[in-house]
Amino acid sequence: MGRFIFVSFGLLVMFLSLSGTEAGVCCPFGWSGYDQNCYKAFEELMTWADAEKFCTQQHKGSHLLSLHNIAEADFVVKTTVSGLKDGVIWMGLSDVWNECNWGWTDGAQLDYKAWNVASNCFIFKTAENHWSRTDCSGTHNFVCKSPA
């Protein structure tokens, strides 16, 4: 009888540790797994830089969320951010225009820049499934992503 209880308890612990994760993806407790990555939403409101720093301290290789296809975005919306209040989270995308070769439609070189450099961070609006460029000093919830 004691062995049965021990085995049953062991199976229950294993089931609970794997719940919310994709089979074969080993994630830390409280994280959800998908396609060899682990994800966790945080309700804290932080600036982009603080959220990225926080993510790097959570788990080896962890950073703010990056999305590579619609299936991954759907997974994040359904499993990690459903409990967040406003459905707007920081993404790991930032400063994408600092290194690009911009040019004017008349062929002239871009030798004068007057855009707001503070707006080089992105948020993911989960209800609409789209990204928006925003001021990096604002505060939002965020999702950390780490290799499994």
UniProtKB/Swiss-Prot annotation:
The record's comment on protein family reads: Belongs to the snaclec family.
Pfam families xrefs: Lectin_C
In this UniProt entry, which cysteines form S-S bonds? 27-38, 55-144, 121-136
How is the quaternary structure described?
Answer: Heterodimer; disulfide-linked.
- Signal peptide positions are 1-23
- Name the chain's protein: Snaclec 1
Recorded source organism is Echis ocellatus (Ocellated saw-scaled viper)
Highest taxon of source: Eukaryota
Q: Where is the C-type lectin domain?
A: 34-145
